[in-house]
């Protein structure tokens, strides 16, 4: 599920014609990888693309709040014993609701299934792994190169292409939508 940073750096060095590491430091290349992953996953979460989702068990203790995961960007769904909780703007929260303030979620004490959109944790060195599926590797490389070349417009175009590709991929998994129904009149 994760991509070794060393592999990404080697690919970037090849594309930049710097296999000996004379022009660019590992740090510069790793930073472009981090920026690419952050940009891509931030945009995927804005567009509600499933590929940027994670699931975890979240326990809200008796105090009524807990800290969200460190890679949390946006909530998709929070389901407890009583069913799905809905967002509220009020504190204190009531049964069946939750409120997020900064990195803290307020909810009725319970054990919840949390589905959320995330941004991969920053990588620091060549021995790390970037927490993204291998299918995203080419996009991360292309976005990194665009950012490294100081071309944010191209980076955004690649992100858009990736978002559209992944969104279509998700829809293509629907098996049978059932018979077509016409509502409100005759054909």
PLM features per residue range, with description:
Residues 1-187:
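Glycine-enriched, solvent-exposed interface loops adjoining structured elements
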